[in-house]
């Protein structure tokens, strides 16, 4: 039976509803259990009936159809996922529930429920699970859908135009989209689940509670930043738990940390991967600069040198910067003390810049991606070299020459589209009563899929519940746009893609 991809995804999420249902039974929350159990049953029944009616239908489109499925998943699936959430809470609107599910599915983690204690434990588990499945969905889609179409960052290194596949040049080697999707899923799903399980066990060993540990483990792997206790600063695992999570955050820097299925420029080794190297440079470079500022600020006020405070400050900066670079958004428990010690009262611009830069291509991280930043860096370096030596010839290899020329051009196009999207969304939010500064933060948070920026980037946290309904829908659009990226949306509108 050949079921459409959207139905398969719907069925997976319907089955996943029984996990919080079972958990709610175990904690004697029968009302919440019924909400998720019956929603899962209804979903499976609908998937079965629709599947039987379209079982023998041969899909007309290959890769373009799957790209359309990605868009439909992020837009329409939360309509179903929000039903048990609203029914379990009973004190929130359906729009708020839909917003929360879009935020979780796109791994943004924009928390519309400002008080964690307001939600039942099983609802916290459900939100983290939706984000975790959304992260797995993007892991698989990046390799099986976006890479063959030269989208999602792969347009920087591939020979084909964005939205077109290299396989078009060789019709005999055109891959079967469905078969590729199955192969990628069977290869990556066990890795994703195993890493999450390992992180969960390590957090429990560090002293964290089972529910909080599994929610944080899923949030780290999906880079969603969702927490049942409002952040890791209140976690029982302490600095040991932060160190463990820091290691797993590195999976958001480069796909080579867990797979080599999308190697396109010949950098099959992690130490030669430009994304990982530039990510490590930022992760350690920015905290060192902040640490030096901390130290100089302490000397200026003649403060007593305290080594433990200095180390705590450095660790708080190191973890928080890594978290926001990978678009997770967790703040270290030592981040606030580091700000107070250094006098750094407004670190929002640093966090906004890190989130915009983003993580690696084909990871769960959002942003503009490190590979595009690297391509523009190479291009700028080459242009400065030509200014000094106009007759010089690039000594880089063929792969880097590709990045310097066409790759940098496509990366620059993406940056312009990102800036235009940021401008339009900010204007649209401002039109519905959101102050300009808050509109900018919300737009960056949505487009970079870094929801915790809403609380961390401004002087005071932004209350999403006070926003008008149209503003919430605009922010939902921004989150979907940030997850799929503008080039993918434009590719869907291209007649050449569907004609091919």
Predicted regions and their residues:
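Membrane-proximal intracellular helices of multi-pass ion channels
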Residues: 1-500
């Amino acid at each position: 039976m050949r079921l459409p991809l959207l139905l398969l995804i719907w069925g997976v999420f319907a089955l996943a509803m029984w996990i919080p249902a079972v958990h709610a039974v175990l904690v004697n929350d029968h009302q919440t259990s019924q909400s998720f159990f019956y929603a899962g049953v209804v979903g499976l029944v609908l998937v079965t009936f629709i599947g039987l009616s379209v079982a023998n239908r041969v899909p007309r489109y290959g890769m373009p159809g799957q790209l359309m499925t990605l868009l439909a998943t992020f837009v329409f699936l939360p309509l179903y996922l929000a039903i048990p959430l609203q029914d379990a809470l009973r004190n929130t609107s359906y729009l708020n529930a839909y917003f929360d599910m879009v935020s979780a599915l796109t791994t943004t983690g924009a928390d519309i429920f400002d008080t964690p204690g307001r939600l039942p434990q099983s609802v916290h588990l459900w939100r983290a699970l939706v984000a975790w499945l959304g992260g797995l969905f993007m892991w698989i889609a990046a390799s099986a859908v976006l890479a063959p179409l030269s989208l999602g960052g792969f347009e920087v290194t591939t020979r084909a135009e964005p939205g077109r596949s290299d396989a078009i040049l060789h019709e005999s080697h055109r891959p079967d989209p469905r078969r590729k999707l199955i192969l990628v899923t069977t290869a990556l799903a066990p890795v994703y689940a195993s890493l999450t399980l390992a992180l969960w066990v390590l957090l429990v060993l560090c002293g964290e509670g089972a529910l909080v540990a599994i929610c944080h483990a899923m949030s780290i792997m999906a880079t969603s930043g969702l927490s049942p206790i409002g952040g890791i600063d209140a976690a029982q695992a302490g600095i040991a738990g932060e160190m463990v999570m820091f290691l797993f955050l590195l999976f958001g820097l480069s796909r080579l940390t867990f797979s080599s299925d999308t190697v396109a420029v010949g950098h099959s080794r992690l130490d030669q991967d430009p994304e990982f190297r530039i990510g490590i440079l930022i992760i350690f470079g920015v905290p060192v600069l902040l640490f030096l500022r901390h130290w100089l600020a302490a000397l200026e006020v003649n403060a007593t040198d305290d080594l433990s405070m200095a180390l705590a400050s450095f660790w708080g900066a190191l973890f928080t910067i890594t978290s926001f670079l990978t678009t997770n958004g967790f703040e270290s428990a030592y981040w606030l003390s580091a700000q107070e010690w250094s006098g750094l009262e407004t670190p929002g611009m640093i966090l906004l810049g890190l989130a915009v830069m983003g993580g690696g291509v084909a990871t769960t991280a959002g942003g503009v991606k490190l590979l595009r930043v690297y391509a523009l860096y190479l291009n700028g370096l080459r242009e400065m070299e030509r200014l000094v030596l106009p007759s010089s010839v690039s000594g880089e290899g063929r792969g880097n020459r590709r990045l310097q020329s066409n790759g940098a051009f496509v990366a620059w196009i993406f940056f312009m589209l990102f800036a235009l999207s940021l401008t339009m969304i900010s204007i649209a939010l401002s039109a519905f009563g959101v102050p300009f500064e808050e509109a900018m933060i919300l737009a960056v948070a949505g487009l970079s899929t870094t929801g915790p920026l809403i609380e961390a980037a401004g002087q005071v946290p932004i209350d999403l519940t006070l926003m008008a309904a149209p503003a919430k829908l605009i922010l939902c659009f921004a989150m979907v746009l940030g997850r799929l990226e503008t080039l993918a949306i434009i590719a869907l509108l291209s007649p050449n893609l569907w004609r091919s």
